[in-house]
């Protein structure tokens, strides 16, 4: 079981840990929310340092840039590839071919710039309120969304690919365990505000459903790029939803 945790850390982060990878990579999906909680806590702690001297803009930038660093930029790269393929391609095969091209096109660049700007704005609002638990929750729920898509949609490439080992063996049990763990880790912080908890999970599920729908429509399934993209989009949706809650209520 711990081999799944080792695989999850090696897959989702820049950190190197001792131990053997799981024989079945889908078993690492159980641990995705746990790794997300660790990364979210790390980023929130890094944001606290500049915020302690009153520099909320830098605190927000630290979370955005730090998130790219600790994930090796893998998820952001997935978003760029997905944007280039989905909006710069044509038929299914052409779209998949573009997504495999390492070159970032105009749609990918626009997606990354929009992501960074919107994340910075949303996190700025959260740091101004000292909402570190919300920052961490966005990262956690981003990894939950990856599990939900992997467990519910087929792999799009017939020849397989980097993420096929995760998607091929995933099922309802992985989704249920990941969802339960996510609730267990977030509930202690938001049990006094069930509306906010509902809002966070609602934003995450909306992001997952949106990306899943687009991916099924465009390529008939998901790829590693799509799993990376859904993590980034979920973080953005969760942080924007939390920011709106602070603004409106």
Curated annotation (Swiss-Prot):
GO terms for cellular component: plasma membrane. It is found in: Cell inner membrane. Keywords: Cell inner membrane, Cell membrane, Cobalamin biosynthesis, Magnesium, Membrane, Transferase, Transmembrane, Transmembrane helix. One of its GO terms (molecular function) is adenosylcobinamide-GDP ribazoletransferase activity. Its cofactor is Mg(2+). It is a multi-pass membrane protein. It comes from the Bacteria. Its EC number is 2.7.8.26. Joins adenosylcobinamide-GDP and alpha-ribazole to generate adenosylcobalamin (Ado-cobalamin). Also synthesizes adenosylcobalamin 5'-phosphate from adenosylcobinamide-GDP and alpha-ribazole 5'-phosphate. HAMAP family: CobS. Belongs to the CobS family. This is Adenosylcobinamide-GDP ribazoletransferase. It comes from Chlorobium phaeovibrioides (strain DSM 265 / 1930).
